[in-house]
Amino acid sequence: ITFSKIYRSCKSDSDCGNQKCARGRCV
């Protein structure tokens, strides 16, 4: 399930590549 095209859902920073996981979203 994708909540937004900009903020991907995540469980950890590693799910976001060079971004960080914050409150379930990559920022």
UniProtKB/Swiss-Prot annotation:
A GO cellular component entry from the record: extracellular region
UniProt keyword list: Secreted
Transmembrane segments: none
Subcellular location: Secreted
Organ and tissue specificity: Expressed by the venom gland.
Family note: Belongs to the u18-CNTX family.
Function: Not toxic to mice by intracerebroventricular injection.
Protein name: U18-ctenitoxin-Co1a
